[in-house]
Design a protein with these regions (language model features):
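Transmembrane alpha-helices and adjacent helix-loop boundaries
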Residues: 1-174
């Protein structure tokens, strides 16, 4: 058995296969960077929206909750197929890279919004009350009080998600 492996190893470890693996690795890392960047920006918006208590934002909050709960429960490969079968009739001839990138962004946004929301909720309520006492508006409170304190809670699970997500995006890299 080991002899056969040694005999067929040169068929696998050749230049065209090496180039193919490097190209797939580049696509995987590229989709991970794009997906996590978009996911972090949109996820921050969704996390803030989910924490909102305004009655005007209640319908958007419900949509955000449904989006996050749906996309976190569907496997990535299934989302790839769903996006393929939704985008292809709407935009015929769209590249598979675009379809894969849209899928990656949808999944990353759902997962990272939960990571960010958990970090935002880790800030003690007394800190937020203190910011209200100082007449901070909602944006100042978020940028100057809540986000700086929540980074220490957000970064470890976000880094773990990025490592896990590299494995998921390899499904779409070929």
């Amino acid at each position: 058995m080991f002899e056969r492996l040694l005999e067929e190893a040169p068929l696998f470890f050749n230049y065209p296969n090496f180039v193919f693996i490097l190209e797939a690795m580049g696509r995987t890392l590229g989709m991970t960077v794009v997906g996590c960047t978009v996911g972090f920006v949109v996820g921050l918006i969704i996390a803030v929206l989910r924490r909102s208590t305004s009655l005007m934002l209640l319908p958007l909050r419900a949509v955000a909750i449904a989006y996050v709960e749906t996309f976190r429960r569907i496997p990535f490969l299934v989302i790839l197929f769903i996006v393929l079968f939704v985008i292809e009739p709407l935009m015929p001839g769209s590249s598979l890279f675009v379809i894969a990138t849209v899928s990656v962004c949808l999944v990353a946004t759902a997962f990272l919004s939960e990571v960010i929301r958990s970090g935002l909720e880790s800030v003690p309520e007394q800190q937020i009350e203190g910011a209200r006492t100082l007449n901070f508006n909602s944006l100042q409170m978020l940028l100057l009080v809540v986000l700086p304190q929540s980074w220490k809670v957000i970064l470890p699970p976000a880094a773990a998600f990025i490592v896990m997500f590299i494995k998921d995006t390899s499904l779409a890299s070929q």
